[in-house]
């Protein structure tokens, strides 16, 4: 059994699998030497456990974009928490979520144990050296502001790539809400050509066949409800077709 780097506090591990997610997405954690561990299924249980276990590491089953507001709450309340989101596949919007939250990392469920151990070491060291105030201030955005920030990061990153001219135009129109038929009319081309351009972009970014391009690169803006649990559910529903990735 491999242990974390000497000098770090004993590791407490939270395995979080929210209702609707597949626990088979968890990686093999047998190589981690932990002081204590627990499996949880509700956001309320996770937040309460982090209150009682400061400095714990979380491994969550599923893509982070489907639980965006939950992670915002986690990092706002417990800014030094390390979170690994484990899944069979990730979408471009998930990469943007990883880039926004300093201590959130994407891992594939088939990741070798030795790699997970090393990533845990580096992440835990980074968390204890980070200013909590910096992370707290970054996570005070409102729900619409947070969703727009993630979507903007995704769009800027994807459009900065060397895309074919037709692919760039198709991407822009689809993300603006145009249907494939309307996109074809605006570009003066056929629906099949639009479909082919979309498939090329999906292949470029490893987007599964069953996931529409707009759902892979954009989180839909949820209706904001003052109930703490309602926005989490709305963003989870608006992040698109997570079931296709399990």
Spans of features found by a protein language model:
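Short alpha-helical "packing" element that flanks the helix-turn-helix/winged-helix DNA-binding module
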Residues: 167-174
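Recognition helix of helix-turn-helix DNA-binding domains
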Residues: 177-212
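Generic alpha-helical secondary-structure signal
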Residues: 49, 119, 186, 197, ...
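Charged, compositionally biased boundary regions
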Residues: 151-154, 174, 193
